[in-house]
Amino acid sequence: MVGDRWTLLIIRELLIRGGCRYTDLRAGLPGIATNLLSDRMRELESAGLIRREDAPPPVATTLYHLTDMGTELLPVLDAIGRWGVRYMVEPANGDAFRGHWFAFPARFFLRDRNPDGPPVSIELRAADSPAVIEITGGVLSTRLGTADQPDLVLAGEPRLILALFAGAFTAAKAAELGLEFSGDRSVLDRVLARPAAAP
C-alpha cells in the first residue's frame, strides 16, 4: 500500500502541514483525481497511518493527521527526496510546485552554522504562495506566508532556489539565471553547506 501511486505524497503533505482538511490535501497534490484521493485516504486510515478528527468550533470540518506509525515513514521520504533532488533543479514543462514543499529541501540542505547568532529569516517568493525559513538557535523551521522584516528575500523559479540550497548553483549562477536577491546575502553563508559567493 505504501508503494501505491500518490500514497507517499499524501504522507508528505501531512508531514509538512500537520492537520489538513481534505481540500488542503487536494490543493497540495496537483493532478490527483478526487476519487483516487478518497480511496487512498480510506486505505491509509484502515492501515492505521492516518486518523481523522473534527476541527474545533466554530469550524465544521474534518482534519486529517498522521498517526505515530505514519510519522515513521519520514526517513523513507527523506531518502527519496535526497535521491531525487538532482531532478528538482532541472526545468521541466508542466511541473507544479507548492510553496510549502520547500520544507523538505530546507531540512536536507540547510543548517544553522552559527546557532549563537541572532534569529534570521529568509522569505522565498516562488510557486503559488510565499514561504519563510526561520533560523533561531540552531533550529530551522519552514512555514507558509511572509515575514514582517525578512533578512533576505529570494524571488524566482523554485528550481533555482532548490539548486542554490542543494549546492548545485552558486548564488552568482542562480542570479545569472534569474533568481533575485534582496537583503542581507550573508545569511546564506550561515545556512548553506558551502559559501554562496554572493552575486
For each predicted feature, which ranges?
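N-terminal helix-turn-helix DNA-binding core of bacterial DNA-binding proteins
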Residues: M1-I32, A47
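Basic, amphipathic "hinge/linker" alpha-helix immediately C-terminal to the N-terminal HTH DNA-binding motif
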Residues: G3, P56-A79
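CheY-like receiver
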Residues: E45, D54-P57
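Basic amphipathic alpha-helical segments that dock to polyanions
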Residues: L37-A47
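Acidic, aliphatic-rich amphipathic alpha-helical segments
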Residues: M69-V132, R185-P199
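C-terminal interaction segments
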Residues: A147-P199
